Amino acid sequence: MDNKKIVLLIIFSTSLLFLWDAWVKEQEKFNAPPSVVAQANSAAGVTQSKNNDGLPIPGSELTASQTGSDLNGIPSSGDTADSVTPRLLPSGEQIRVVTDKVIAEIDTMGGDLRRLELLQQPSPEDENVPYSLLHSEASRTYVAQSGLVGEGLPNHKTVYQVESGIRNYELTAGEDKVVIRLLAPETQGVQVIKTYTFHRDSYVIDIGFEIANKSDATIRPFAYFQMLRDDTPPPAHTMMIRSFLGAAVYTDEEKYQKIPFDDLDKGKTDYPANANNGWIAMLEHYFLTAWLPPQQTPREYFAKRQSDNLYTAGVIVPAGVITAGETVTTTMPLYAGPEEQDRLAELAPGLELTVDYGWLTMIAKPLFRLLSFYHSWTGNWGIAIILLTITVKLLFFPLSAAGYRSMAKLRLVTPKLKRIQDQYKGDRQRMHQAMMDFYKTEKINPMGGCFPILVQIPVFIALYWTILAAVELRYAPFALWITDLSSPDPKYLLPVLLGISMFIQTRLNPTPTDPIQAKIMQIMPVAFSAIFFFFPAGLVLYSLVNNILSIAQQWKITKMYGTAPSQDAPESPASKDAPELPVSNQVINDSENTEAPASGPADSPKKPVNIPRRMHKRTRKK
């Protein structure tokens, strides 16, 4: 009865279930039938926000001309269609911007940010091509839109003109920022200029509106900023990657809250709408786009499904009260880039929570901090993982040592356990009782080797999510053929070495007395090795180093505590005279042909077997 092997079998079975679940969900995504969810307009009129210092939030009937409004006076991105494929948005002239971090394309149609390539993040299809975070294509849609709410004011359907006439901008040496100004047609005495400001060494883009009121009336416009995207997952370079895709909102009161696209399909709006702090974002694996309104500024967050499979998430803020002849500027920072945790924590409170560590965040965060510390020291994420593995191993050393000592003792008495099983193979209840009595007599805990494994399982899972979620490990090289620790080993050498290390470990463990368990233990190294073909190389590296350290520790402890006693050594009094196991002792002595001592009489009777009372009763019944 090898309980450690049972635990390993449970872990193996659970891993298979996770793989199956991931595969089924992935297939459902591709086989999902087309569906169109009807959307209702927001309530008519102007509503009052409870957290906006008395400033009104616009309703869907601001003007008669906004009959096509989708939310709070914001025009929808198009008519409803029956297709689940994103449409190609209307376009005008393209304005190209190149900085040290990004290549951006702004469309004069709506002044939308239609494309954003991250120069320091390779594409999963071709690592020589920058990753495209934003894009507007026939098959994929993910753009940043903005505009003003009010009669005749420009929105993301307005055609802008480039004020300077320049179509290509580049952040040159000595410049800290580059500014693009788009001029909207003047209507009803209101002139609006939309601005984009790109900064050096930053993924933050400031999008603003300069509103000049040349009329005689006072105006109270609102500005909206939204992300429009489809529900198509970004391309992944490993089948084991599955992370959250959808919107998220954060406020000081409600904290961090995810908004899955499925909830928007069902019309659920269980998220904080009105606040004067926080942010709203669109998330995908490794990357995000987030609107970051200034603190203590009244705002209304919104997220909903548009037509077909397009979704919006954004924020509405008041642009202020603009009297005749006055010019007001309102600006909204947009972060569009990788989920670099140190950078996110500096931008806005709670923004680092967008890094998805799953349900073991409390363990994963310290692991990543320690991993980052080792990386800052070594400059190599692979070496950092090895050092982290050694640290975790040292942390659990006392538990592991206790478990291995228990296994070493169990290895010594395995032949005796086998004889007990042979004696009671027709009566499982008596066999179990005899084995438990034997464990008690020999002071062996059969579960002693399982506890260290159970304790380390959460650490293993947390490290799995750390490696999957940390964009810092994306395309991070280790050595030789390992050029990306976040993707599987391209040559499968690490999984094979892991399987070999597991096989060596099984040879150090007590031989299972059950033939079925013995067969399973022979298969497990091969099965685990095959499963780890699809795991990130960084996780396989952790498991391999952990196994090597475990083998060294287990071999040393087995050598110290697991040496079999000499054939001439006298039998311990506990195993000889213990009343709990007289029958099994008798069987063991008989099988070893134990003879009476030479000093005693030749015809001296054998010592009677001291059978416990409960066994006498069973014998009489039988």
Curated annotation (Swiss-Prot):
Composition-biased stretches, type Polar residues, lie in: 62-83, 583-596
Compartments where located: Cell inner membrane
Q: Which CDD domains match?
A: 5TM_YidC_Alb3, EcYidC-like_peri
Q: Which GO terms describe its molecular function?
A: membrane insertase activity
**Residue segments, region Disordered:** 47-87, 563-622
Segments of skewed composition (Basic residues) = 613-622
Q: Which residues cross the membrane?
A: 6-26, 381-401, 451-471, 525-545
Q: Which domain of life is it from?
A: Bacteria
Q: Which GO terms describe its cellular component?
A: plasma membrane
**Biological role stated in the UniProt entry:** Required for the insertion and/or proper folding and/or complex formation of integral membrane proteins into the membrane. Involved in integration of membrane proteins that insert both dependently and independently of the Sec translocase complex, as well as at least some lipoproteins. Aids folding of multispanning membrane proteins.
Give the UniProt family note. Answer: Belongs to the OXA1/ALB3/YidC family. Type 1 subfamily.
Subunit-level organization: Interacts with the Sec translocase complex via SecD. Specifically interacts with transmembrane segments of nascent integral membrane proteins during membrane integration.
Q: Identify this protein by name.
A: Membrane protein insertase YidC
Native organism: Nitrosomonas eutropha (strain DSM 101675 / C91 / Nm57)
| Gene coding for it | yidC
